[in-house]
Amino acid sequence: MSDIKERLDKVRALIQEPEFLEGKGLSNEVNIRIFCYEPENEMVVRHFENQLETDQFLDCHLIVCNLYKTFLSICDDMDITDAIPDMEEADGSAYLLEQLNSAIGNGEFIDKIQYEPHEPGDVLMLTGVGEVFPFMRIHTLLEALQPYFSDVPILVMYPGEFDGRHVKLFNRLTPNDYYRAFNVID
């Protein structure tokens, strides 16, 4: 337990450092960092996220986006939330997933996440990656987000593994290629 808390403390310190905020040391790569953690530490990480979100003494402007809540908001906007349980019961989970994936893509997420103006010191923290699965996959969203947040560091709280080339949700699912991010804390 103390290992995860020590790693989270390092994240708190890192996101306030000028080098992180300016994307220095990344060889002109996009400033996307992934904080990987064991899925069984989910509640510790959520507590940390809540603390960060309410910390008024951070030396950065933290914008927190819970991807699961974003997904639910998109469903509400499309006026489909109430129909989802009935659709799943009538047509099955696979059909429901297919329909939701065809109706809700990266563009809908970007529309909800995007904000203006971006200010120096902003940090976009993406949470809820495990909760929103299988309705959204982080590797495809990160690819789509890059043009919109090229000037804002992105921190992904990820319940799984990232080896510098592949993300593996929950340490169990088939790895997906994603090579444009960096592990925030080893």
Label the model's feature ranges.
Residues 39-44, 70-71, 99-106, 130-134, ...:
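Short acidic, S/G/P-rich loop/turn micro-motifs used as interaction or catalytic elements
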